[in-house]
Amino acid sequence: MNISQEVARRRTFAIISHPDAGKTTLTEKLLLFAGAIQIAGSVKARKASRHASSDWMEIEKQRGISVASSVMQMEYRDCVINLLDTPGHQDFSEDTYRVLTAVDAALMVIDAANGVEPQTIRLLQVCRARNTPIITFINKMDREVREPLDLLSEIEGHLGMDAVPFSWPVGMGKSFGGVFDIRRDRMRVFRPGQERRSDDDDIIDGLDNPEIASRFGSAFEQANGEIELIQEAAPAFDREAFLAGRQTPVFFGSAINNFGVQEVLDALVEQAPPPGPRQALERLVEPQEPKFTGVVFKVQANMDPAHRDRVAFVRVSSGRFERGMRLKVARTNKEMRPNNVVSFLSQRRELLDEAYAGDVIGIPNHGVLQLGDVLTEGESLRFTGLPFFAPELFQAVEVKDPLRTKQLRIGLTQLGEEGAIQVFRPEAAGGTLLLGAVGQLQFEVVAHRLKTEYGVEARMLPSRYTMARWITSENPRALRKFMDANAAHIAYDVVDAAAFLIGSPAQLRVAEDLYPDVKFHAMREHGGQVFGSHA
């Protein structure tokens, strides 16, 4: 196959949801139905040492939440599917945002009992801002849940897009019998509680088939009436509207019981777009271009604790990657020749020889690559849109054993470069390192990882700071004057960008009034250190 043909069969998407909506379970079942794994590691049951394939970090196994974004690749119906499982806990929205910059579509999971929840709305706003197409899976229909028509109205109201059902539940809770595939005019009847995929599911053709009515009685009667209603009232599916983020295909099911998963997988192949062009500051990069370009959207330390490694996750933006090819790191202008590049099934890795636009590859390295780095075959490019948000919570960090100070700094540097936490180094000599986060759980995760991965017992201490703003100025003297006058509140992050640490909004307003030539930024971008959104 040539590059264009390989790109056309790629599908790269992220799974997003509110915590506990069943996202990790659905990830497992998609892998199961695609044949990538033979048995799903049920997150709820936790049989012996079996854990969900996509929850691999020690703290994730203990707490049953996804805190690092996992990447998994599988083949299904001659398509190469790159699935990115994002953090399910609300404190990790920043890492989720960065993952959403690396995908061409999103699969939104909604808990049928709770409907559209706040975290989902925030993530959907990110997708809408990027015009990312969204497929919706309404999960947990085997429980006592809300009426499907109400859920559709809520999706449309909150998300501002038309919801177009592709499948419809027959019953719910104890009377849940399966899902009716509206487009194929057939019902798939599932046996609940399966860990293994079943290739001999009961399929009943035709909405008017008397067998459905006789087997499912009043549950089917209600479903039949609702299907007739939505076929009259709901807009027809328009793929262009879907690709522009104005329509979302909706599927119902129960991931833990394998209900409705097959239909979602088929829709990802049939409806989700192949990789599209990517905007760099210099030009638009087309996926079919012959030369390789890629962006580091995530850095993960210690994927293999035995080897203390660090892997840069690179989304291939264009061309073909070949193992051992010469690549330029645009930020440093240095050359590298990665030989042991890997593809993923969560933390299980396989060496790969080639990759194409849309694929996610892992490049093991020792700090050469940072978040936002652009790799090319020689061209200088800076891709846009990979942000760091100013933290809202701060804690000082000290090491309990002074002899482990070096390990603390190494650990925090790596975790900071990975984006797990923001680390600020005070300009004032002898200042304590500060950690910045967007949610409290980040501090707990970092303390746990310092202990298990770096052998460091860290002590977290309260901080007087509540805000941070990165500072720039077109007038170097004005910036220096501000930094000298506020030296006690200046710190540097892991890429040595200067930040002003603040105790209250009033303090920020005073600084803005006194130093009009200095700009205060609530977001730092990686594309060539371009700054966005002011205070």
Swiss-Prot record:
Compartments where located: Cytoplasm
Any one Gene Ontology molecular-function term assigned to this protein's record: translation release factor activity, codon specific
Pfam entry (one): EF-G_D2
PROSITE patterns: G_TR_1, G_TR_2
Biological process (GO), any one: regulation of translational termination
Gene3D superfamilies per UniProt: P-loop containing nucleotide triphosphate hydrolases (3.40.50.300), Peptide chain release factor 3, domain III (3.30.70.3280)
Binding site for GTP: 17-24, 85-89, 139-142
Domain of life: Bacteria
InterPro entries: EF-G-like_DII, EFG_III/V, G_TR_CS, P-loop_NTPase, PrfC, RF3_C, RF3_dom_3_sf, RF3_GTP-bd
Chief location of this protein within or outside the cell: cytoplasm
Keywords: Cytoplasm, GTP-binding, Nucleotide-binding, Protein biosynthesis
Task performed by this protein: Increases the formation of ribosomal termination complexes and stimulates activities of RF-1 and RF-2. It binds guanine nucleotides and has strong preference for UGA stop codons. It may interact directly with the ribosome. The stimulation of RF-1 and RF-2 is significantly reduced by GTP and GDP, but not by GMP.
Family: Belongs to the TRAFAC class translation factor GTPase superfamily. Classic translation factor GTPase family. PrfC subfamily.
Protein name, as recorded: Peptide chain release factor 3
